[in-house]
Amino acid sequence: MEFETHEDAYLFYKDYAKSVGFGTAKLSSRRSRASKEFIDAKFSCIRYGSKQQSDDAINPRASPKIGCKASMHVKRRPDGKWYVYSFVKEHNHDLLPEQAHYFRSHRNTELVKSNDSRLRRKKNTPLTDCKHLSAYHDLDFIDGYMRNQHDKGRRLVLDTGDAEILLEFLMRMQEENPKFFFAVDFSEDHLLRNVFWVDAKGIEDYKSFSDVVSFETSYFVSKYKVPLVLFVGVNHHVQPVLLGCGLLADDTVYTYVWLMQSWLVAMGGQKPKVMLTDQNNAIKAAIAAVLPETRHCYCLWHVLDQLPRNLDYWSMWQDTFMKKLFKCIYRSWSEEEFDRRWLKLIDKFHLRDVPWMRSLYEERKFWAPTFMRGITFAGLSMRCRSESVNSLFDRYVHPETSLKEFLEGYGLMLEDRYEEEAKADFDAWHEAPELKSPSPFEKQMLLVYSHEIFRRFQLEVLGAAACHLTKESEEGTTYSVKDFDDEQKYLVDWDEFKSDIYCSCRSFEYKGYLCRHAIVVLQMSGVFTIPINYVLQRWTNAARNRHQISRNLELVQSNIRRFNDLCRRAIILGEEGSLSQESYDIAMFAMKEAFKQCAVTINTIKHPARCEEAAIQAGDPVQEENQYGSTSTQIGPEPNIHAGNVPWQAETRREKRSSLNNTSKKAKHVAQSETVGEGSQEGFQHVADPRQSQAVLAGQFHNTMPGVFQNLINTNFQNIPATNMHQNNPPG
């Protein structure tokens, strides 16, 4: 391989490094004594070599060097061409291909150079005055916060002994279940700064319900004693599911970037389609940096809740203003109509010069429903988002709740949530909702939707009787629907060719199922089934197409849990057994034997005196013949049945049991992984098998080990310096 110049060689090595996942540095170069031209150059990984520092250094800085040998050595031939003299490929550390753009050597500053007058920020200029920093991958954004000593005193505020309590909690949870994930962040002074964790069931829930995630900071912003933030989703029973917890030191871009990165690693790199947050510039910058493909939306209820704090003379014209504002927000059919009404509104109430109103308009695509066509919030919008999120911890977290009390309540909260979901699953298996009309839409969705969603959809079907529609024009596809229930008119656009329907009430966007206005238009158009693209799988009984099964029999001690466990195993057995005639024969044989043994056991329990007779006369309820083919008579010994990596038989080893205290032992209902994860269980890094493709460990978000933890547990932290981005008002 040849290069025209040594700079071309370095660009090649940089491109290679970015694709593999490490940062680069120019290690050395040499010039000819005669011609003064470069004749030799060596490029390396940024972790090449070892740290050299004076013993009397006042403010020692962390160094990334850990003795890595990866490098490329190039030399110049007499004809002027450069060639590779030596190349070392192996690294002594993990590579980060997904996060490679964060390395200093891979950040593109061309946009800054070409647009210097708009993007360059003078020293001490507030970050809120900077613009055009949305393309974080292409700008030197993260390093733009400058490595300085601003974060030296920032740490997680804890009471005496809380650090040990927190560490013990994290290690116990991971000991109970190896798929429990956690990560910690330390300052350069070895102070505990940020903590993140998510339980095994939260990771499994995210696989099925990753479309919409709410990031909740109300406890943190309200200055609770426990600086708690939450990642929350919603399952197919419209129950909140906890997708991660964080304890944060401050409200800065750095903190939120670290948190989002840690959460993304825990979730195997799977990014949500939509993330709902409160209006916050630091969170906005972090999501744009870590989750650029995710649609970031503000909670509309939170936006409206800020009106009294940001507008003068609010009480003088509150009713009139809100009426006009709601008309603009909820009754604007198009983006142009929204803009027109907004400008008319701020002129009428003399709000053009109010900075908050200007910023609100500039960010209208983050919160205004008119700009969110095609997005589904799964019910996590408006006030119901706040109520759903707060319902997780409202019984366990109060302003003065200590960390110890919170961790104890955490186990109880998990137990409550798992019981509620198990009960809803049981109801779904055990009974069907009642039909309340002869509507074909109701019959269609009876066994498709989960019970809670069906009941809500059923109200829309019944409400269609109170709607009257008129066509806006003979040639058009837009209908005006008068809803006599709320005395409002709605516009419905129906494209029969594309099976695309849209209502101005935006029920589908907010809730994930069609409204009564859309239903009456479909009905009057001769369409009597809900178009498939408006039946979200997340709301159906098939939301989890492969159920997690508990291997520990101690987790299945009630009729409800036993019933759910057997039903889920039967589904997996059906999937595997139907793949071939041989697997079908094996499954049938196993079921026959199971029926016989169950009959004997039940008869023994009911009639102990006749147990021997019951064992002989127990019938076989399974038909002998396979209606799809012949059944083999030579089955052989009972096999071990597997579904993916899920063993059918219980593990022989005893799983270690522990709990936070005597009152939270039942928190062990966390769904157990069916694959033993790989990674350190002795330190702060663990990524299980399903997520190894990311090649990222939680420990990579750490810096150095504080003394308070060194005697408690063996750790293997890598000394990676943190980028200091401690500003809570980043460019927007």
Curated annotation (Swiss-Prot):
Localization, per the record, is: Nucleus
The record ties this protein, via PROSITE patterns, to: ZF_SWIM (PS50966)
Membrane-traversing stretches: none
Where mainly located? nucleus
Tissue expression remark: Expressed in hypocotyls, rosette and cauline leaves, inflorescences stems, flowers and siliques.
Belongs to which family? Belongs to the FHY3/FAR1 family.
Protein name (database record):
Protein FAR1-RELATED SEQUENCE 4
**Which gene codes for it?**
FRS4
